[in-house]
Amino acid sequence: AIDVYHVWFDPGLDVQVARAGMAGRILAFHVSDWRVPTRDLLLDRAMMGDGAIDIPRIRGRVEDAGYDGLIEVEIFSQHDWWRRDAEEVLTIVAERFRTAV
């Protein structure tokens, strides 16, 4: 899986995504955003469009590498999104998926 939260800062990301694509090894694509500043390295992911990650650029590289599967939204957010009403979160996820992914 290519999880933008774990790889967005890697200067060699484009090369490695292309390499993985040539080998047919991209099996999943996960999106969230990196909150600045972050409060927890694992459980403070931001909603797409609210952080530092250029998700559309990375998505373009992943698709250029041949991936055309599902995109999984992973908002692990104990301080924010997990505390909100589920319908509100789903509405925002859908809107942000259209505008920030």
Mark where each language-model region is.
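Histidine-acidic metal/acid-base catalytic patches
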Residues: 1-101
